[in-house]
């Protein structure tokens, strides 16, 4: 099962736990208002509440949070990882892991649109988190994230302009402002 868990109910957990095994991947891309921006319609309070339901799944279930790392959240993943670390420990969610996947398609969301000096600052904020998570896989993911942030691949031509236009249209339709949520990206969106 892969879900954003907004419609997750206890009855789902009770049913799923009857299976011999299974997996649940939960999409959380950023911390609080950043996640609500990226996953429009998301509500952080409901996400946290429903995440606690996974505690009722037996250890025969693999559980993880998956973060899609992109332009918007590439510099603030430390916020999400800090929250994750605290949340799983405070709520005894010992079976919940964290993983990430870089967004490479569509090209307009690639992290390479964020200037390297901003990504290097993000790496510095991630370094103290290596080794602090409760499982080996999650800790390895932080190292992979830092390596990913150093990418010098070139996005396809025109994809930066697509990013700017896409974000402008989203902000108009949603009555939002990308820079209110991600002020550190001023250099990207005010270019």
Where are these regions (language model features)?
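Core AdoMet radical
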Residues: 1-10, 16-49, 61-71, 93-110
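A structural motif corresponding to the C-terminal end of an alpha-helix
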Residues: 19, 50-63, 87, 129-137
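Enzymes that process phosphate groups on RNA ends and nucleotide/triphosphate substrates
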Residues: 29, 47-51, 116-122
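Short secondary-structure boundary/capping segments
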Residues: 40-43, 79-84, 115
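Flexible glycine/acidic-rich beta-alpha junction loops that bind and position SAM and/or redox cofactors
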Residues: 69-75, 92-126, 139-140, 144-147
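Catalytic cores of alpha/beta
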Residues: 71-88
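Radical SAM enzyme core and accessory elements
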Residues: 123, 127-191
